[in-house]
């Protein structure tokens, strides 16, 4: 199999203090805990540069913030000042007249060693004060990642929450006809750019999941008509089978510390949940029922596990302790529940719900209370959390369409976005923030 090497990136963060330093008081902000909020008008003129790279970087920053649903970029055609020197204080009246509450200015220069230096400043236009100023150094080929890091810094400064733009998605890329569909493992940036294939075989692949350190992916593949769980090293492209069990293995996922893989093993007509220690390769059985127990997901502290089971007749969600004790049903609504995944914040569990011939993506609290459906359609499935626990990605196949596509939606349920990919796509999994 052809190997792929992840781009190594060295980014140096330097605070930009000085004449425009920000006082400790809070300036313009967005409270994302209030539910659906009015997007904040923000102006992002093209970053200064000698070769056009500045405009490319600022465009990605703008696209990231707009897609979050929390920011409304001001139309560039209305700008009085088309570009701004970040070393000079902006004329705030030229921005407040456009109702821009925040202003981002920046500059991209190339150092003598070939690296790019990217610097930006974030301004509160009505207070006339700088809120943030940072600069980064990186290789030219990593310019998109610098843009995502800048967008994360702006998002965090204004909302008080960590951003999620400097992340990747691993997913199943689908091509071909419905009767001759090829499914390959692929990886991309969270905005759908920089897509790369990780596998290139005719074997079916399903349910890829990132490790907490972002360097490994576990997934299921049918090889020799036998489904197995594999561990893929993203740096080297090397892979190995996670255990050699007599029956089917599926729905793999890492523990929060990355030391174990939890999965479902089929025995006769039943399937139960097991964990495997990746160092010793020893397995521990957590459930023992005459039912189908599958799709396990750890709480972020590793103490509890949510999973789906049809032990009550229909697929429902259950929570248990990490040793398998205390198995308790938490879903009681009409229909069936599947593909649960615990939020990185620990406060919610996302799931797929099938009811009335439709599929919904929803969330509930770990005790089963507060169920909310965020989106409903012909076929929605497989939610995955952004690392800040504020956004979900899932896949949807519309009625009559040729194949599935990826979508993102925030916890308000209002900001739903298509994530464009070169081919049909399913089974997304969101990485932690990159470093």
From Swiss-Prot:
Keyword field contains Signal: yes
Main location: periplasm
Gene Ontology CC terms: periplasmic space
Keywords noted in UniProt: Cell cycle, Cell division, Periplasm, Signal
One GO term (biological process): cell division
Signal sequence extent: 1-26
Location of the protein in the cell: Periplasm
Subunit field text: The Tol-Pal system is composed of five core proteins: the inner membrane proteins TolA, TolQ and TolR, the periplasmic protein TolB and the outer membrane protein Pal. They form a network linking the inner and outer membranes and the peptidoglycan layer.
Function, as annotated: Part of the Tol-Pal system, which plays a role in outer membrane invagination during cell division and is important for maintaining outer membrane integrity.
Similarity field: Belongs to the TolB family.
UniProt name for this protein: Tol-Pal system protein TolB
Gene: tolB
């Amino acid at each position: 199999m052809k190997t792929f090497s992840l781009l190594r990136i060295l980014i140096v963060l330097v605070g930009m203090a000085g004449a425009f330093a920000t006082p400790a008081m809070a300036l313009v902000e967005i409270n994302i805990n209030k539910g659906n909020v009015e997007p904040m008008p923000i102006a992002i003129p093209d970053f200064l540069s000698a070769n056009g790279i500045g405009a490319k970087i600022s465009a990605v920053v703008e696209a990231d913030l707009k897609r979050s649903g929390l920011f409304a970029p001001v139309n560039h055609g209305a700008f009085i000042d088309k570009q701004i020197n970040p070393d000079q204080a902006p004329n705030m009246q030229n921005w407040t007249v456009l109702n821009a509450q925040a202003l981002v200015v920046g500059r991209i220069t190339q150092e003598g060693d070939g690296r790019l230096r990217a610097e930006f400043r974030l301004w509160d236009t009505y207070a006339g004060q700088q809120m943030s100023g940072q600069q980064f150094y990186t290789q030219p080929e990593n310019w998109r990642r610098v843009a995502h890091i800048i967008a994360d810094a702006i998002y965090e400064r204004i909302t008080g929450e960590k951003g999620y733009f400097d992340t990747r998605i691993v997913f199943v890329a689908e091509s071909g006809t419905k009767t001759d569909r090829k499914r390959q493992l692929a990886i991309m940036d969270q905005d759908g750019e920089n897509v790369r294939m990780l596998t290139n075989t005719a074997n079916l692949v399903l349910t890829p999941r990132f490790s907490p350190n972002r360097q490994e992916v576990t997934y299921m593949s049918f090889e020799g008509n036998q489904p197995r769980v594999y561990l893929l090293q993203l740096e080297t492209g090397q892979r190995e089978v996670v255990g050699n069990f007599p029956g089917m293995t599926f729905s793999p996922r890492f523990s929060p510390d990355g030391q174990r893989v939890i999965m479902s093993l089929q025995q006769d007509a039943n399937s139960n949940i097991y964990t495997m220690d990746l160092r010793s390769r020893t397995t521990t059985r957590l459930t023992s029922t005459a039912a189908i127990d599958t799709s396990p997901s750890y709480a972020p502290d590793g103490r509890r596990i949510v999973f789906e089971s049809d032990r009550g007749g229909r697929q429902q969600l259950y929570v248990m302790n990490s040793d398998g004790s205390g198995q308790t049903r938490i879903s009681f609504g009409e229909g069936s529940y599947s593909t649960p995944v615990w939020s990185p914040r620990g406060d919610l569990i996302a799931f797929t719900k099938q009811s009335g011939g439709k599929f919904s993506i929803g969330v509930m609290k770990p005790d089963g209370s507060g169920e909310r459906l965020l989106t409903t359609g012909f076929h929605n499935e497989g939610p995955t959390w952004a690392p800040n626990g504020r956004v979900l990605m899932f896949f949807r196949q519309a009625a009559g369409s040729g194949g599935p596509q990826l979508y993102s939606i925030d916890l308000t349920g209002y900001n739903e976005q298509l994530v464009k990919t070169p081919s049909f796509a399913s089974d997304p999994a969101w990485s932690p923030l990159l470093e």
